């Protein structure tokens, strides 16, 4: 039997995932602050602002801008808000979400200033026990999922039964979720790969080819794995869908906002100029400095994140970034 599911945030990924949930037979309520988006989904089953490629969203999707109305009957609440605004947005829902509801994060990022993962931010904001929090991450480019191309993802929750409930609620003929209890690993994968995607995109935009991209991706994977394991993650997670899988998708597609943002930097645009031409948030941009700070906190070197931080804050070029990344000393891989 279908569930009542609320999605907080009607951006491209939130809307595409809402469609997955509706296709799986659930009753889906989208919550958004923008009245134009609310009216578009509610009255016309169309999100012309964030997901115009889908001409008609399912009939069992609706929308509201009222927080209490959005979540009052929810069995599952999905959070698809820009990571750096999650805490501010979620405190407005504290006390409104039913006690039995599972809260699921689609967000990927490390909070600036606190260096906290999204599971920590969500649980603190809503005063939520660990067994009622789940995260979803994987090679999930929103436009391809909106077009119903076959895809898989990973659902993580410390309570495997609740992870399974969430997975069952988003299983369709084209969308296959797997389950794990490694919340930390899933969160770290989703956050840190965005920094790698920025760097790969920058290299591509600057005209470098496959060798350079592969070099950055593999060193990025090593960096995010070391950081994740230091934070308490299972190393196996980094070699599955949420790790290598997401890295491949994000670092190799113009559909990735992080890759595209990096490519624009590589072509010579400033951070401000690249931001202006982006449709939506490239989460890797605010996450980069937080990753460097987290590495310092955990005593784990983060050379790629550090060099990308220099790109974003000092405006160094792609060639300078790559030179700084590898240095001149011979080291073990």
UniProtKB/Swiss-Prot annotation:
Active site positions: 193
Keyword set, alphabetical order: Cytoplasm, Lipid biosynthesis, Lipid metabolism, NAD, NADP, Nucleotide-binding, Oxidoreductase, Phospholipid biosynthesis, Phospholipid metabolism
UniProt subcellular location: Cytoplasm
Superkingdom: Bacteria
Keyword NAD included in the entry's annotation: yes
MF term (GO), any: NAD binding
EC number: 1.1.1.94
Keyword NADP found: yes
GO biological process: carbohydrate metabolic process; glycerol-3-phosphate biosynthetic process; glycerol-3-phosphate catabolic process; glycerophospholipid metabolic process; phospholipid biosynthetic process
Disulfide bonds: none
Pathway: Membrane lipid metabolism; glycerophospholipid metabolism
Binding locations of NADPH: 13, 33, 108, 142, 257, 281, 283
GO cellular component: cytosol
Binding-site residues, sn-glycerol 3-phosphate: 108, 138, 193, 246, 256-258
Catalytic reaction(s) noted: sn-glycerol 3-phosphate + NAD(+) = dihydroxyacetone phosphate + NADH + H(+); sn-glycerol 3-phosphate + NADP(+) = dihydroxyacetone phosphate + NADPH + H(+)
Enzyme class (EC, first level): oxidoreductase
NCBIfam families according to UniProt: PRK00094.1-2, PRK00094.1-4
Assigned protein family: Belongs to the NAD-dependent glycerol-3-phosphate dehydrogenase family.
Function: Catalyzes the reduction of the glycolytic intermediate dihydroxyacetone phosphate (DHAP) to sn-glycerol 3-phosphate (G3P), the key precursor for phospholipid synthesis.
HAMAP family: NAD_Glyc3P_dehydrog
Protein name, entry field: Glycerol-3-phosphate dehydrogenase [NAD(P)+]
Organism: Bifidobacterium longum (strain NCC 2705)
Lineage: Bacteria, Bacillati, Actinomycetota, Actinomycetes, Bifidobacteriales
């Amino acid at each position: 039997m279908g569930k009542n599911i609320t999605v907080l945030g009607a951006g491209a990924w939130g809307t595409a995932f809402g469609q997955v949930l509706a296709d799986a037979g659930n009753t889906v309520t989208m919550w958004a602050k923008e009245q134009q988006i609310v009216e578009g989904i509610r009255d016309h089953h169309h999100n012309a602002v964030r997901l115009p490629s889908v001409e008609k969203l399912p009939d069992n999707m609706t929308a509201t801008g009222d927080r209490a109305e959005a979540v009052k009957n929810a069995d599952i609440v999905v959070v698809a808000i820009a990571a750096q605004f999650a805490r501010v947005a979620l405190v407005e829902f504290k006390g409104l979400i039913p006690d039995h509801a599972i809260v699921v994060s689609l967000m990927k990022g490390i909070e600036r200033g606190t260096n906290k993962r999204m599971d920590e931010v969500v649980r603190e904001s809503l005063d939520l026990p660990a067994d009622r929090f789940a995260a979803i991450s994987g090679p999930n480019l929103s436009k391809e999922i909106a077009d119903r191309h076959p895809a898989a993802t990973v659902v993580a929750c410390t309570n495997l039964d609740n992870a399974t409930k969430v997975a069952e609620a988003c299983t369709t003929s084209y969308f296959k979720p797997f389950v794990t209890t490694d919340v930390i690993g899933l969160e770290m994968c989703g956050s840190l790969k965005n920094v790698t995607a920025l760097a790969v995109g920058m290299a591509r935009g600057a005209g470098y080819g496959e060798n350079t991209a592969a070099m950055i991706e593999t060193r990025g994977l090593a960096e995010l794995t070391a950081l994740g394991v230091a934070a308490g993650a299972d190393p196996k997670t980094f070699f599955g869908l949420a790790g290598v899988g997401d890295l491949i998708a994000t670092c190799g597609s113009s559909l990735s906002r992080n890759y595209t943002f990096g490519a624009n930097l590589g072509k010579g645009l400033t951070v401000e100029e690249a931001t202006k031409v982006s449709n939506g948030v490239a989460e890797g941009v605010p996450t980069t400095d937080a990753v460097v700070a987290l590495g310092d906190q955990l005593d784990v070197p983060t050379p790629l994140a550090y060099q990308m931080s220099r790109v974003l804050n000092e405006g160094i070029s792609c060639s300078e970034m790559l030179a700084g990344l590898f240095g001149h000393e011979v080291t073990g891989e």
